[in-house]
Amino acid sequence: MISRIAVVSVTALVLSVALHADCLAQRGGRRGGGWGVGSAYNRMYDITTVETVRGEVARVEQFVPYQGALPGVHLVLTTGSESLSVHLGPAWFIENQDESIEVGDDVAVTGSRILFLGEPAIVAASVRLGEQVLQLRDWRGIPVWSGWQRW
């Protein structure tokens, strides 16, 4: 009798884990939540459009780059000539950094200039605040939160 209960319990546990993993995969879960190396969003990063912009942070907000992706963080940067959305990365990664970027900070952002929903934006590779640098992507645009590198 105990072995039958054990089999039923183990089966229920396995099914529960499998269903949970399937739900995570549909939302991006372990694959970066829509922010990973192979995601449609990440493929917008173009090393030929990398530039550095400087300005003052006007807003720091969460956003979802597309349906089904986990929330990310972007900031609105006011430069001398424009107001520009700067996409930093997934919220779970940005919010777990030692330092934070605040409204009013003067920053230098290096990243790929893209059109996002018809508006200019920068997908950030790094953000410099004083002497501190928040590294978000390598020179190829591969996110540091991916946990691995392609050679």
Where do the protein language model's features map onto the residues?
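Short boundary/loop segments of OB/S1/cold-shock single-stranded nucleic-acid-binding domains
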Residues: 29-52
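OB-fold and OB-like beta-barrel modules that bind single-stranded nucleic acids
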Residues: 54-57, 104-112
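OB-fold (S1/OB) nucleic-acid-binding surfaces
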Residues: 66-88
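Short nucleic-acid-contacting surface segments enriched for D/E, G, S/T with interspersed K/R
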Residues: 93-109
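OB-fold/S1-family single-stranded nucleic acid-binding modules
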Residues: 114-143
